[in-house]
Design a protein with these regions (language model features):
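Mature catalytic core of soluble alpha/beta enzymes
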Residues: 2-227
Length: 227
């Protein structure tokens, strides 16, 4: 019938990056190229913000020559540092991206994680202090040679926001971006209903949830040690 519109089926694409499975699902556009570009964009941010990939900007910053106190950073890294410093001030250091020495020591992504000795933990903790970073424009100065940065607490949220910006620019009004424990919903379902996001029950089967949220154009973020 001429007055009928074909129902668009959701399209989805997944990939392993950011140490998790990344999945993007679009509900109102049948354009796989948008999905491809979205995951490529996510990969480009991983290659910029990872502290372990040797080609990343953050890795290069952290492994700067011992006598180099000042580095020039990209706009994205500048934005993340500025935002992180703001929350460090608000939390009086409770949030701190200079936690990298502790992150490396604990090595949470190891196949066989081991609790470090207490004296090593104390030694690494002494290197953590957001006040040792001085940001002026795109120039970052380290006030201590032991200072290194880890965006692990903010990178996924920042990346999810950038992916949403890209999808909206491409005319997408209904989508779900899943970056592991970070789920961002773009708009609502095509029928106007909210998205249903389940919160996994720790240490249970993957299909077992303890709570379900119904949200529109919002994010749900969880964190745990069970994955």
């Amino acid at each position: 019938l001429s007055g009928c519109q074909r129902k668009i089926e959701p399209i989805t694409k997944s990939g392993f990056m950011l140490n998790t499975f990344v999945t993007v699902t679009i509900y109102d556009k049948d354009d796989p190229e948008i999905l491809d570009d979205c995951l490529d964009l996510c990969r480009s941010y991983e290659n910029m913000l990872s502290r372990t990939l040797k080609e990343s900007e953050v890795y290069q910053i952290n492994n700067r020559p011992a006598n180099q106190q000042t580095v020039t950073v990209s706009d994205d890294v500048r934005n993340l540092i500025s935002m992180s410093q703001h929350y460090s001030e608000l939390s009086d250091g409770g949030f701190d991206i200079t936690i990298e020495p502790l992150s490396s020591l604990w090595n949470f992504t190891s196949q066989k994680p081991v609790v470090p000795p207490d004296h090593e933990i104390q030694k690494a903790a002494a290197k953590v202090d957001y006040r040792n970073l001085k940001l002026e424009g795109n120039t970052l100065t380290f006030l201590s040679p032991d200072t290194a940065i880890d965006f692990g607490a903010v990178a996924k949220g920042y990346i999810a926001d950038r992916l949403k910006e890209y999808l909206v620019k491409e005319g997408v009004k209904s989508a779900v971006i899943n970056l592991g424990g970070n789920v961002l919903c773009v708009g609502e379902k095509p029928d106007g209903e909210p998205f249903k996001i389940g919160l996994q029950k720790p240490f249970a089967d993957r299909n077992e949830t303890i709570e379900t949220f119904q949200i529109k154009d919002l994010s749900v973020v969880s964190s745990g040690v069970y994955e």
